[in-house]
Amino acid sequence: MEKGQLIEFRHQGERRLAVVDRPDGKKDWVVIDQQGQSHKLKPQRVEYEIPGGPYTVDDLPSFLGEVDQYLDPSSLEVAWELLIEEGESITPADLALLLFSEQSPSQCYAAHALLAEDKLYFKQKGNHYEPRPSSQIEEIKHQMRVQAQKEQEQQGFIDRVNQALAGEKVTWEGSDRLRLEALEKFILFPEQNHRQALDILQTLGKPGRTDETQNLLIELGIWQRHENLFLRRSAYPNQFPAKVSDVAHAYLTNPPPDPDQERFDLTTLKTYTIDDESTSEIDDGLSVETLADGGHRLWIHVADPTRLLSPNDELDLEARKRSTSLYLPTGMISMFPPELATGPMSLLQGQRCVALSFGVTLDEVGAVRDFTIAPSWVKPTYRLTYEDVDEMLVLKIQGEPELPLLAEAAKKRAQWRKSQGAITIKMPEAIIKVNADEEVQIYLQETSVSRQLVAEMMILAGEVAGRFCQEHGIPVPFRGQPQPELPSDEELLSLPPGPVRECAVRRCMPRSEVGITPSRHASLGLDLYSQATSPIRRYTDLITHFQMKAYLRGEPLPFSGEQVQEILYSVMPSSKEATLVERQTNRYWSLEFLRRNINEVWQGVMLRWLREDDGLGLILLEELGLELPHRFDRPISPGDRLSLKVSNADPHRDEIRFRELLANEA
């Protein structure tokens, strides 16, 4: 390089024109650009040398003015058309001669500038430029159009976000959904790669943090303040596919033919359905039939959703994918479309309903003497709550003799199961409800005669279903539980009676197992058991219905043992995930309840140690039935009582901390 030479180099990716001023050391030079700024350069950084000179910095404005009049990008297309046939490469000087018929310094630099900025017609190779093939140009044009559309959509999205944040009403475009989903996934799965979400947040001037992004979606009205992130992370569908909904609506007015035309008519029996007041899927009812010998047959009527289904049809496969209905504090998400689940599938008061009925007689000690199972017609007489039944039993209403008979049978069954080794654990259970205004209620579900009555009848139906399927070689999901190793009597007696002792027993109970081989269920005290009483809300029960009903009709079974096992392999993980979502959601709302009631004093009892070395124990808030961890800084034993106040509760972070009150504070 020489002093006074005009050169081009790049500074932070930007093309700069500069005049060489002086050498700096053996290899470097100092140049002064059009903005008057000095730069230290190595010769290798020079991208183009302008002919002519010598130049001074004062020459640059007029020189650039001359160059501007030649900078017409459309002229490159003309040059490309002239050169493509020959396929020859050119230099900026060649292009200047071709376009301007001269090769003045300003014309040569203008040609260089056109080629340097061109991304379409020419490709640089060394100091020369080759015309691109026409096919490559069309592909680049397509990519440029796609990129321009993306940029336009991105800018439109940013504009709509800012409008929404300013309180204006916006209509989101289809392309916005992908960007909003990118932000949602960033919150739900922060450990994954989220380049798009981070780019969006940077463009919006928002920090790349999940909590701030969640607040953004709430401000935009995309998410609720208490959005259920556990449900969103899960694979559980929140909506039914259009095809499934269409089938459901069609079946309301035009149901398929009933495969069980010869149903047993039990509509003359008085039938009670007993549920919580909020229950909308009514899947069981109870009756008592008086026999000629003065004895009684208990009838457990179970809703018959398979009357509307065929194995592997749209409704069946959707239910299989869901595996269970989801019961959350904010409401239920049904395994079937709700118009069916709460309509023709349910046992509705005063309506003629299809059912699968289990008729059972018991011996004097409560064991099953004989049973019958049949598809049936029933007509529920009363829809009762548990509280209704408890009150009617206390009042001994003469017009309802069936209820005391059912209660007595349930009591006898419980005693018989206990004699067979059944293990009953009585722990307080918290019921958490959240209404439309996001008001949270937590109350204890009390043990009652009515709840024991219904539970025993359902267990009885499960025993009968299991025995029937075993006797006839019908492969269905059997539920078993290994025998636990319980604490010794001495160990249990050393613990205070009540929740602490029950907790010690519960801790020893192994998980139940589901398979096609019958096995003993330890805590129920039954040699075999197959759940069959909740086919509207539990898919494994639905399989049992499909299989038993086909056998009763004398038809081939819809599923072989191998197929039932394969279905269980797919259903059980989904069912476990649904249970986890329920548990996580309940915990979230319990922490939110405690956060809102931070000034309340709660009475608790220490249940057991979680990590005694760390002082971490499990406590029970007795008024609420909530079991939560608490770190103690003093000596304490299971069964010790304490008064607590919440010191910090953050449901979003799943954090809860209590402060133990001193005697004079409580």
Curated annotation (Swiss-Prot):
MF annotations from Gene Ontology: RNA binding; RNA nuclease activity
Record's keyword terms, sorted: Hydrolase, Nuclease
SMART domains: RNB
Knocked-out gene: effects: Essential, it cannot be deleted.
Highest taxon, organism lineage: Bacteria
EC number: 3.1.-.-
Cysteine pairings via disulfide bonds: none
The RNB domain, residue ranges: 263-553
Family: Belongs to the RNR ribonuclease family.
Name of the featured protein: Uncharacterized ribonuclease sll1290
Biological source species: Synechocystis sp. (strain ATCC 27184 / PCC 6803 / Kazusa)
